[in-house]
């Protein structure tokens, strides 16, 4: 059996990285602007993504979870905010990361359709 050219990174590691990015984005948003909704959204969505990544770690076939729902929801919310404010940083960065995470989870869903 041939080894893949590039070893595949398990999806849950991307999920944990995405979780850290969302939580840190909420904290940075709170520190820069002093707005509690930034902190609350970062902690809420980061926690949900963390639960999803942990569930995916426990069972790699479990992709219909908090990680998929969180990333898709966050794409919409942060994408609209980025469009409204016309800035890439920081909401556009989070929207882009959420879009990549949603795409990666979507591909995994298509690959493991049971």
UniProtKB/Swiss-Prot annotation:
Keyword hit for Chloroplast: no
Top-level taxon of origin: Eukaryota
Protein name (Swiss-Prot/TrEMBL): Transmembrane protein 14DP
One example of a Gene Ontology biological process annotation: regulation of heme biosynthetic process
Keyword annotations of the record: Membrane, Transmembrane, Transmembrane helix
Transmembrane stretches, start-end: 8-28, 36-56, 63-80, 83-103
Coiled coil regions in record: none
UniProt similarity note: Belongs to the TMEM14 family.
């Amino acid at each position: 059996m041939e080894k893949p050219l590039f070893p595949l990174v398990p999806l849950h590691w991307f999920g944990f990285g995405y979780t850290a990015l969302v939580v840190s984005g909420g904290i940075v948003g709170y520190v820069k602007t002093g707005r509690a909704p930034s902190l609350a959204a970062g902690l809420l969505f980061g926690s949900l993504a963390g639960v999803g990544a942990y569930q995916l770690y426990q069972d790699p076939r479990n992709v219909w979870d908090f990680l998929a729902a969180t990333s898709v929801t966050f794409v919409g919310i942060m994408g609209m905010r980025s469009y409204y404010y016309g800035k890439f940083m920081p909401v556009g960065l989070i929207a882009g990361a959420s879009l990549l995470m949603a795409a990666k989870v979507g591909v995994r869903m298509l690959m493991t359709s049971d």
